[in-house]
Every structure is written in C-alpha cells, then in structure tokens.
C-alpha cells in the first residue's frame, strides 16, 4: 500500500508538470517551423548540465511534442509525457504494451542531448535500433540534433533527410503532417498531409563508428555498446577509441537487459588449444555414473554433486589417487560438466541441434541464440553428448557484465511493460525507482485464477478442450509454452484433433512477423514459446472484440511473474477486450521443484479428485508466493555475481586507467622512473633491509634483467639506501641508453610494448579469476562465504599481477629493439581476430576451462604480436 501511495504521489506531481507543458505547447502551436528551430537553438545554449535540463524541462518537452505533431503526425498523450518525465528523472517507466514507449522517450532524449555529451538509446536488437532511429529521426533532425545508429558487424549510420532540399522547403514554408483544423487525439494515415509526409522522410547514411558516437543521440543494442567499451580498452592508439564517455542512457526492455541478462557477461575472446578428445572421453565416462548413487542433482541450483561413491568411482576410472588434488581439479570439472550435459541440459528445451551445431535457446524469450555459447567447457560437453563437431574453447581478453557497464552512466533510465515486480532489484543494483504509468485507455482485460491439475496429462486434455471451445466460436487463442518441446507436443495433439493452428517458436523465428500479424484474427489458434512477448503487436481482426478479444492460455508458470505478465500483456492492449488463464499441474517444473508439497496438501484438504482441477484465489496466491521465492533465489545469485564483479570492476577500471595513461602520455620517463623505483625498493626491502642481507636471493630476484647489468659480487654497500641507489641508477642509465638507441620512435615503440604487456597479464588474470570463482563455489559447500573468499584471493592476485606487470615492463624496455611498421600492423591484425561473445554464464555451475593445466613460465609473456625482444 505504501508503494502504491508513493506511485500515486509521483503521478500527481507529474500531472501538474504535464499541465504546464500543455500550456507552453498551446503557445507553440501558432509559431512557424523556423521559430521552433530557433527556440531549440536558444535552448541548446542554455542547457549545459543535468541541473539546467531540470530547469528547462517544460519548454523542451513542449517543443518535442509540437515537433512530433508536425513531422510524424503523432502527438504524445499526457501519459506518454509522464513516462518521459520518469525517464528524465532516471527512473524505470513501466508502460504497458502498445502505450508508445518509443515516442515517450523522444522528450527526455532531446532534453538531455542538449547538454552535448551524447545520449544512448539502448534496444535489444539491431533491427529495433535502426527502426526506432528512422521512426523518431525526423523529430530530432527538425530540432537540430544529429542521430547515429550502431549495429553489429561494425556497421554504423547517421539518420539524414532523404531529400534535404524538400525538407528545407517544408520548414521554410511551414508544412505540417498534422493538418490544420484536425482536433482528434490520433491522426490516421489517410488524413495526414501527404506533401509533408514526403518532405520529412529520412534514411540511413553509412558513417564511421566514432562519428556515430559523436552524434547527439546514438541508438544501438546493449551488446554493441558494451563491446565497443571493451574494444576501446584494447586499442593501441588513443585515437582509435570510438566512445566518448557514458553520460545518459535509456534502456528499452529494461527488465530483459538489466535483470534477465545480468548474469550474462560480454566477453571478448580468442581461441584456446583444448583437444576435443577430452570432452568425448568424459561424455562416455559420465554414462557410467548412476544418479542418486554416484551423484545427486540439485535442480534449484542447476548443479551436480558427487557422492563419496561417485568420487571413488571417478578416481578409479580416470586413474588418479585424489580427484580433489589441485593438479586434478580440471578433471573434476570435466566430469561435472559431462554429467550436467547429460542430466541438466535438455535438447529442445535448453538448446536445439541444427546443422551439426548446438544452439542455445533463451529461457526467457524462447528465441535461438546463435553464436552464444555456454562457458567453461560446458558447451563442448553438450556437443560431445550430442555427437556433433566440438568447437574449441576460448580465452578471455576482456569482459564486463551489463550490471557494471550500465552503472558507469552518470544517469540511467529504463522503460518496459513489466518492471514493478522487480523494483527492489532495480533500486538495489541500479538506484532506479519504478514508476507505473497509467494506460491512456482503461484496461478491460479479464485475468482468470489459475486452474491446477494433479498431472500434466489431465492439464493438456483440458487445455485442448478449452482451445477447441473457443476455436468453435471464432475467438482467437494464443497459447504460451515454456519450451520448443512443449509447443511441439501441444501442436501434435491439436493436429490429431483436427484443429488448424500456427506454431511460433525458435525453429520458425523467420516467420515471426507474419505469424504474429495473424494471431488476432477470427478463429486463429497460435502456439508460441515466450518469444511472442517482446517487440510484437497483436491487433484484433474484424469482429474479434465482440467475441471477447484475444484469449491467452498459459500452459505453465514461469519462474518469474514478470514473464507471465508479459504473456498476459499480449492481449487487452490500448483498451481492447481480452482474457487470460493459466493451466498448471503439480508435475510442472516450477511446482514440482519448489511447491508440490504445499499445493498437494491444499488439494488433499479440499478432496480434489483425479481429473478435477482446483481454481481458487488462495491457490493463485500460493503459486505467486512460490514465484516470489524463486525470484528471491535468482536475485541472490545475480547479487553474488554482482558482488564478485564489483571487485573485478574496480580492478578493470584501474587497468584501463593505466592503459589510458600510457596512451595519452607524451613522455614515459616519470612513469618508468616510478616502475624502476617499485622494482628496486620491493626487492631491497625484502632481502636487504635489516642486518641479515641475502645478496644471493636478491640476485636471483633480479635475474630477469639483461645479464651483466648489475655487479653485486664485487661491490660493497654500507647501507640498504646505497644498494637501492646503485640498482636504481643502473636501471635508469640503461634505460637512457636504450632510449638514445631507439631514437625518435622510442615513445611509439615503448607505448606499444607496455600496452601489450598489460593486455597479456590482464588476459591471464581474467582466466585465473574464473578458476577462483569456481573454487570458491566449491568452498561454499564447506560453509565458507564465497564472496569473502573471492575478495581475499583476488586482492592478493591483483597486487601480484601489477607487480609482474612492473617487473616485465622494467625488463622489456631494457631489451626492446625498434619495431617496424609492418610488425605493428600485423599486431593490430592479430588483435582484430579476437571474438565477441555474449556468453551464457551461470555462477553456480561454472566449469574449468582446461582438461589439464599447463605449467606457465614464471613472469613469461605469451605473445606481443611481432615485437622483438632481445634475450
């Protein structure tokens, strides 16, 4: 009730703001196009900060509203203006399907773009980024802003007038798409001023990535914004960076991007050298293990736990004495992965096999995710299980979660149709409140209580009866399923019954638009996985409203109430009639794993007979509580990931800041002086600080430097300070000699070398961190807090890495010889071969990256492109 009252208070405040905007808008109505453009230029001079933007919100929103009316023939409703205010304030605006989020976003985008630091509109796919930029582009161009679009595969565009001369003429002669004298709320296409529609057409012109980011507004996907950030921190020249900072972003489908994908890091990776035979061997070994005897399955945590018998069996089969010995831990992870592939990951539910490839199915949308792979060798384990070619594992060069990427923005906002159920997570993780924006027309959809059966067989029989009944009266039905397997099972039952229908799942996603367009027509039956939720608009055909509108039938409850609400949201849009009902059984995954006992007791108390469903508000409430419990578990997992990644994020920023310092530095003398000082002082302090000097150990610790650099056998030192000064001066003299030898190219050569050293150490560090994550999860079974353990280990590891970076730089700047332009070009090409992966990531069930750990050279470097270093 308190939250509800708070939402009411916010809306009351917004309503007052809207009335002020309406007053200004009525004054603008009589002004010429050229005057509106002049007012926009004046505003741009006034708005230089978020505080200025707050002050000029009323004029800016009114200007956008009038510009949209004239260029698009669309006037944002008052509720859309409210949504825009919420977005400007850095909140999540919950706006139902069909309520016009795209248009609502133009107002805060314009206002914040006036500041001149760039605004990012984040969408979930390339098509939507292009579509929305083109659709809303005329508004921004009319008001003097530039609009860019970034797409995958390096494609970038600017939105420009299709016919600049005609657009100029339309502005000068005061043309408007909205005809004079039309006073309705919604302008239909046939009533629009055709001449103005033609004049305000826009198109995409290809530009560079950097130019797209220099536009006032940049549309793109969450993946591309994140990948560009990571790529920017791998460049060898500062001018190759494309982003210009993280100022203000609006995330469309915010719940999907910021919550559902929060466990899914963006990863830039390259190939590893793992042998496919290892995965095939363990796929065969896994078949010999008996469930509940050799191992147990934790379905809630999606992991496998070996019993003592299982451990003994594994040691015997693999031929090792102790499976948990540090040298064998990679074998343990291979076995766990193979068992997971066999018992936890199901074909046509979690993945499909197409053209000899294992392709992941998105658990939230049901869409196929080609290119995305499970990490840590799990994908290879599934490939081995299915007998398809095994693709090589990868090495991580750079990674970031969406949680940490989007928290870099000075101001972040989101919009979606379903957010209120996740408000606590939005607040805790991103500091964003959720504001529920009212619909323009009242919602009249009927949401029935759940029907619960004892078995899935009974449930499906009743679902088919319900579909048949509604089909016969001509009412369209959309049936939501949770997997491809279940959508095809239901389809086969309907075929036997002779009920015509269409199927929409990941296997038929190419036909999505066509299938969705028909879903609201009279007599149409559509079976869909969750993919029918996002970015689709189901319009009712003639006569359907009189039959009760589109009927949604849910065949199972999802772990998240939000996904169920998205399915319901397919009907009843913009005041249309509609209804929804969920058919459940005690054998459904959610109820079986988390609540069958409680619901079974209720059914026994009420003496429900076999085949007889129960439908009661109390039961619906009980199921909702089960979902809340599961949401809590999933939030806890995401929170654990975030706490771990927060540690990594501080370290990532430190490394990237060091890279920037090197990229921007005009002269490296001071920087290298600090490094030499660090190398010398740490060793003198360790081996020669007291009375007991250990010169032999000191010599060994400095043995990575060029031979003959130090003469510690002949010299006598009266104090550790004298020893320190001698060592430091020798390093400095040798560096100055090397600098002289390289000549004018020294800065370029040293910069190139230092960046490659940092990148190589950071890459290896990320790999080690993955191993630590896996190890601390195992320790959590021993009652140790995995977060505390992770922090302790990674803080030490990071300090060690920074020490190794300093040692390696100090060593290699004294050994380096001049690098040719050809060498540098080849190194850049090597960098270009890295892969971009939006990798499926599950904190609870990570697995090792290698079957056997190869001994690494102490402080050695794997590769620096073609740079040559004297040994």
Swiss-Prot record:
The free-text function statement in the UniProt record for this protein reads:
Part of the Sec protein translocase complex. Interacts with the SecYEG preprotein conducting channel. Has a central role in coupling the hydrolysis of ATP to the transfer of proteins into and across the cell membrane, serving as an ATP-driven molecular motor driving the stepwise translocation of polypeptide chains across the membrane.
What is the species of this protein? Answer: Thermotoga sp. (strain RQ2)
Location within or outside the cell: Cell inner membrane; Cytoplasm
Top-level taxon? Bacteria
Protein's name in the database: Protein translocase subunit SecA
State which Enzyme Commission number(s) the record gives.
7.4.2.8
Q: What is its main location?
A: membrane
One biological process term in Gene Ontology: protein import
Extract the SMART domains matched here.
SecA_DEAD (SM00957), SecA_PP_bind (SM00958)
Q: Which residues bind ATP?
A: 80, 98-102, 537
Keywords from UniProt, A to Z, are: ATP-binding, Cell inner membrane, Cell membrane, Cytoplasm, Membrane, Nucleotide-binding, Protein transport, Translocase, Translocation, Transport
Record text on subunit structure and interactions? Monomer and homodimer. Part of the essential Sec protein translocation apparatus which comprises SecA, SecYEG and auxiliary proteins SecDF. Other proteins may also be involved.
Which reaction(s) does its UniProt entry say it catalyses? ATP + H2O + cellular proteinSide 1 = ADP + phosphate + cellular proteinSide 2
Q: Which GO terms describe its molecular function?
A: ATP binding; protein-exporting ATPase activity
Q: What class of enzyme is it?
A: translocase
Q: Which family does it belong to?
A: Belongs to the SecA family.
- Report the membrane topology from the UniProt record: Peripheral membrane protein
Tell whether ATP-binding is among the UniProt keywords.
Answer: yes
Query: Looking at the UniProt record for this protein, which Gene Ontology cellular component terms does it annotate, in alphabetical order?
Result: cell envelope Sec protein transport complex; cytosol; plasma membrane
